[in-house]
Amino acid sequence: MVIFQLEYPLHHLVLFEVDADQPHEHEHDLILMGPFYLQQHRQTN
């Protein structure tokens, strides 16, 4: 999985995930989450 991180004002983060194992039409998932969750996510990877 490859995660592209874009940082926006007001401490909002947008993660753009591309999973090669998924069908092409389901390849892109747009997820909104807070900085704290992102920090945990980085630690687990």
From Swiss-Prot:
Q: Which domain of life is it from?
A: Viruses
Q: Does the keyword DNA-binding apply?
A: yes
Molecular function (GO) terms listed?
A: DNA binding
What does the record list as GO biological process?
DNA replication
Keywords assigned by UniProt, alphabetized: DNA replication, DNA-binding
What is the protein's known function?
Involved in T4 DNA replication. Important for the priming of leading strand DNA synthesis at oriE. Binds to ssDNA.
Protein name per Swiss-Prot or TrEMBL: DNA replication protein repEB
Supply the source organism for this entry: Enterobacteria phage T4 (Bacteriophage T4)
